[in-house]
Regions:
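Helix-turn-helix DNA-binding segment
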Residues: 132-159
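Active-site beta3 strand of CheY-like receiver
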Residues: 6, 45-52
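C-terminal output helix
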Residues: 85-87, 101-115
Length: 159
């Protein structure tokens, strides 16, 4: 499966412009008009990155991001916002967003960020030299150890 820039924005003009922009730079993309529409097609094995509007009708971009995180998605997320909100940007990045871009944006900078996010995603999915050994060791964990490991990975304390 090829990496794709998954665009979720309720503004049709933005979706069309981003699709055209990415195509002009040879970046495959697909666009959805809402978070709900994206969720219908979402699978845990999607590759690439998610370009996500912060404020949309219905489910917001932040709500979608939180839901995908709860479902274990590791797809890098680049938030787009027409409302330059520094606290919002900081909160999104602290929660694990790959980047936060204000509208209007510089086309080349956005495409470069999307390409970096896609490269980051590909590097995490490529098996490392010790992948088999790591998998074998993880399979030895007890159910309780797996539970603790999952909570630690989400930033919870082990107490």
């Amino acid at each position: 499966m090829s990496p794709i820039a998954h665009i979720v924005d309720d503004d049709e003009a933005i979706r069309d412009a981003l699709t055209w922009l990415f195509r002009s730079r040879h970046v495959d993309s697909r666009a959805w008009p809402s978070a709900e529409a994206f969720l219908v097609d979402w699978r845990g094995d999607l590759r690439g990155c998610l370009v996500l509007d912060v404020r949309m009708g219905g489910m917001s971009g932040l709500q979608l991001f939180d839901l995908l995180s709860e479902r274990g998605s590791r797809l890098p997320v680049i938030f787009l916002s027409g409302h330059g909100d520094i606290p919002l940007a900081v909160a999104a990045v602290k929660k694990g967003a790959f980047d936060f871009v204000e509208k209007p944006f510089n086309d080349n900078e956005l495409v470069d960020r999307v390409i970096r996010a896609m490269q980051f995603d590909a590097s995490r999915k490529a098996p490392g030299p010790n992948a088999a050994a790591t998998t074998a060791r993880l399979n030895l964990l007890t159910p309780r150890e797996r539970e603790v490991r999952a909570k630690l990975a989400r930033g919870k304390l082990n107490k």
